[in-house]
From Swiss-Prot:
Matching HAMAP family: PSII_PsbI
Keywords: Membrane, Photosynthesis, Photosystem II, Reaction center, Thylakoid, Transmembrane, Transmembrane helix
Any Gene Ontology biological process: photosynthesis
Membrane topology: Single-pass membrane protein
Keyword set includes Cell cycle: no
Annotated GO CC locations: photosystem II reaction center; plasma membrane-derived thylakoid membrane
Transmembrane intervals: 6-26
Protein name from the UniProt record: Photosystem II reaction center protein I
Subcellular location(s) per record: Cellular thylakoid membrane
Originating species: Microcystis aeruginosa (strain NIES-843 / IAM M-2473)
Known function: One of the components of the core complex of photosystem II (PSII), required for its stability and/or assembly. PSII is a light-driven water:plastoquinone oxidoreductase that uses light energy to abstract electrons from H(2)O, generating O(2) and a proton gradient subsequently used for ATP formation. It consists of a core antenna complex that captures photons, and an electron transfer chain that converts photonic excitation into a charge separation.
SUPFAM superfamilies according to UniProt: Photosystem II reaction center protein I, PsbI
Length: 38
């Protein structure tokens, strides 16, 4: 049960970091080249 909880925490933290980095790097207001993002 402990390994399952650890795996869930790892997956959740990974997606959160991915979302944060993707939002910061692909922010339309700071990135004029939106054609590359799409």
């Amino acid at each position: 049960m402990l390994t399952l909880k650890i795996a869930v925490y790892i997956v959740v933290s990974f997606f959160v970091l991915l979302f944060i980095f993707g939002f910061l790097s692909g922010d339309p207001t700071r990135n004029p080249g939106r054609k590359d993002f799409e």
